């Protein structure tokens, strides 16, 4: 993944902080959506979708048209626009998300590994619904941060 601190400095700083703190190590991706919205949501170290870091921050760099192209890396949040924290999502198919409430912070792009996200998405949601835990479990073993050269 490539992060863009120029457009979302607070989001990228938080992501780097959490990565260096091993926040996501051995966590999972707990949510897959397969109808209308096409994202794989990750970032809760327990894999339940209920845990966030002990802080939150506001929305940065949301698209005004609500368009999130394939490969987008964006922050997940609750209805509270200041609830960005540790959960994020990977867009695996061009997706239109509501702009009401401020949208979602785009802070990077997936540069490698979309084939893995596609494989998880192809398996669908556990139980067959359009939104829920991925049928194919996926884990984040570790996250390393490196300066782009």
What are these regions (language model features)?
Residues 1-149:
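Cross-family detector of peptidyl-prolyl cis-trans isomerase
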């Amino acid at each position: 993944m490539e992060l863009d601190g120029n457009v979302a400095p607070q989001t990228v700083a938080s992501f780097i902080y959490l990565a260096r703190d091993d926040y996501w190590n051995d966590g999972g991706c707990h949510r897959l959506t397969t109808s209308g919205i096409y994202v794989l949501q990750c970032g809760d170290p327990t894999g339940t979708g209920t845990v966030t870091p002990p802080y939150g921050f506001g929305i940065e760099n949301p698209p005004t048209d609500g368009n999130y192209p394939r490969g987008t890396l964006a922050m997940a949040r609750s209805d509270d626009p200041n609830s960005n924290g540790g959960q994020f999502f990977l867009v695996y198919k061009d997706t239109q998300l509501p702009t009401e409430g401020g949208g979602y912070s785009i802070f990077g792009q997936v540069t490698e590994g979309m084939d893995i996200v596609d494989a998880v998405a192809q398996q669908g949601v556990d139980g067959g619904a359009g939104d829920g835990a991925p049928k194919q479990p996926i884990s984040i073993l570790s996250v390393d941060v490196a300066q782009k050269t």
